[in-house]
């Protein structure tokens, strides 16, 4: 599935920019024995958000997925590892989560529409300095008010002491993997079309 690269890379890049030498707060998402793990908030429980949460959970992070679909939240609650919690998404619930969150993955996608801004500039002050926002929805306008597209050459910028990673083509950082993933996903359709 081509999005595999996207969701895995979003967590990997977020974890990298949480490192102190990269400008982050110096948090290891998985923690170590005797030290609490990092906290990840995933906005959107669709394919990308679900799998980003799985990736973060696999690293040992404390993960929360926020979504507006109760049936989707029920499904996620039943299928996710124990270190993943679900939360109904609203401005109020997001504001409650931000003070203890290290990494926010914005994975909100509304097909054919611009992504909603779920985190405003005013809300940035709720995060601790050195926290990281990764906007996977940047191709649809971004789901953070302060998002603007970045490149692999200059992937992050800082606003109000919060790092923003808004690379428009996240899989482009790992072209060998992403090309093979896309080929594997599309090849069956090409073969089927040739047989027709």
Predicted regions and their residues:
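Glycine-rich phosphate/diphosphate-binding loop of Rossmann-like nucleotide-binding domains
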Residues: 23-106
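Glycine-rich phosphate/adenylate-binding loop
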Residues: 32, 40, 178-195
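Rossmann-fold NAD(P)-binding glycine/threonine-rich loop
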Residues: 122-165
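Short glycine-/small-residue-rich Rossmann-like dinucleotide-binding loops
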Residues: 108-112, 137-138, 168-169
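A charged, well-structured terminal subsegment
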Residues: 8-26, 184-193
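Short glycine/serine/threonine-rich phosphate/pyrophosphate-binding segments
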Residues: 47-53, 71-73, 112-118, 141-144
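Rossmann-fold NAD(P) dinucleotide-binding segment
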Residues: 95, 99-100, 113-133
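Short, small-residue-biased leader/transition segments that mark boundaries at the very start
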Residues: 2-6
